Amino acid sequence: SIILGEGNWDEGSTALFKNVYNEFPWYSEGVNGFVDVKDVARLMIMLMESDVSNERFIISAENISYQQLFEKIAAAFHKRPPHKKITPFLAGLAWRVERLKYRFSGKKPLVTRETATTALRESKYCNQKILNAFPEFSFTSIDETIKRVAASMQQKLNKP
């Protein structure tokens, strides 16, 4: 799962928000699990305070496509959503070009081999085990997370 939350605009999953804010035109139809950083923190505390030990859990709120994610982020920023579907060929070309740019400029690549591959893959995660362990817990919706994170970033950018 990809953890979504406030953070450095240029790193990690928060860079997805920056790309959409800047109206990056490309999207993929890959699917991944997404979860709010606050849910991860709450569940970590709940696990530490419980009798649960020697267990592994998948912490994921929702499985959605990158296209859906980007459309939701764009709506939160009142920006145009990505509108060009990336193909495996273009994704492969993109990470290679980014790697060349990095070698010559030292600037961190926007797309890596791993991110290109992940963006095209359909990875779905089941959160049932953690919900069985903590039936009182409910995940924050990805819509709510996106609205909160976008509002926070909008405020940092000092734009309405």
Question: What residues fall within each predicted segment?
Answer:
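NAD(P)-dependent short-chain dehydrogenase/reductase
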Residues: 1-34
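Substrate-positioning beta->alpha
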Residues: 11-12, 28-48, 55
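A hydrophobic C-terminal alpha-helical subdomain
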Residues: 27-28, 39, 88-134
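Short aromatic/basic micro-patch
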Residues: 34, 63, 124-125
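Mid/C-terminal beta-alpha module of Rossmann-like enzyme folds, strongest
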Residues: 43-110, 141-142, 147-160
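C-terminal helical cap and adjacent loop that interface with cofactors, partners, or active-site loops
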Residues: 121-127, 135-136, 143-153
